[in-house]
């Protein structure tokens, strides 16, 4: 019998999962984290991605999280996320449509945003050069 611990995955709206597991994997800000019973206490930010947990019978389940926090305590691991969706509830067509929309928006706005930022920085540089040349002429 594998050692188990309680896992709680909570979104801003509801508790997505609460039960006993033998392991959980998430992507922290510094890389992949694997948590097993007896893990050292930990509090860290997690990146958007997958929470993968293994039940005592060996069955693996998956939850998408939009990022958030992972807290590891001696007997319970808690994942707090703004958005958490069970893997089986994800809709591929909706995801692909949202991905395409985001890519289109990024490609349209990215160039304009970069151009505007570059223009602002060039303008700052010009002001800096003018101010410094006038100060140099006063000396």
Swiss-Prot record:
Q: What membrane topology was assigned to this protein in its record?
A: Peripheral membrane protein
Superkingdom, taxonomy of origin: Bacteria
Q: Does the keyword Transmembrane helix apply?
A: no
Which terms are listed as keywords in the entry?
ATP synthesis, Cell inner membrane, Cell membrane, CF(1), Hydrogen ion transport, Ion transport, Membrane, Transport
**Cystine residue pairs:** none
Q: Name one GO cellular component term.
A: plasma membrane
User: Could you tell me which CDD domains the record lists for this protein?
Assistant: F1-ATPase_delta
Instruction: Kindly list any coiled-coil regions of this protein.
Output: none
Chief location of this protein within or outside the cell: membrane
SUPFAM superfamilies assigned to the protein according to its UniProt record, in alphabetical order: Epsilon subunit of F1F0-ATP synthase C-terminal domain, Epsilon subunit of F1F0-ATP synthase N-terminal domain
* Matches recorded under PANTHER family: ATP SYNTHASE DELTA/EPSILON CHAIN (PTHR13822), ATP SYNTHASE EPSILON CHAIN, CHLOROPLASTIC (PTHR13822:SF10)
Q: Name the protein family.
A: Belongs to the ATPase epsilon chain family.
Protein name (database record) = ATP synthase epsilon chain
UniProt source species:
Actinobacillus pleuropneumoniae serotype 3 (strain JL03)
Gene this chain is encoded by: atpC
């Amino acid at each position: 019998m594998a050692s188990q611990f309680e896992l709680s995955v909570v979104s801003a709206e509801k508790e997505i999962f609460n039960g006993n597991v033998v392991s959980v994997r998430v992507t922290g800000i510094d890389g992949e984290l694997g948590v097993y019973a007896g893990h050292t206490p930990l509090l860290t930010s997690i990146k958007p991605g997958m929470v993968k947990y293994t039940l005592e019978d060996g069955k693996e389940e998956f939850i998408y999280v939009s990022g958030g926090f992972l807290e590891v305590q001696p007997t319970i691991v808690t994942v707090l996320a703004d958005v958490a969706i069970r893997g089986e509830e994800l809709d591929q067509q909706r995801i692909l449509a949202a991905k395409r929309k985001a890519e289109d928006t990024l490609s349209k706005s990215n160039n304009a945003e970069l151009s505007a930022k570059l223009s602002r920085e060039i303008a700052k540089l010009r002001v800096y050069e003018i101010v410094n040349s006038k100060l140099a002429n006063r000396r």
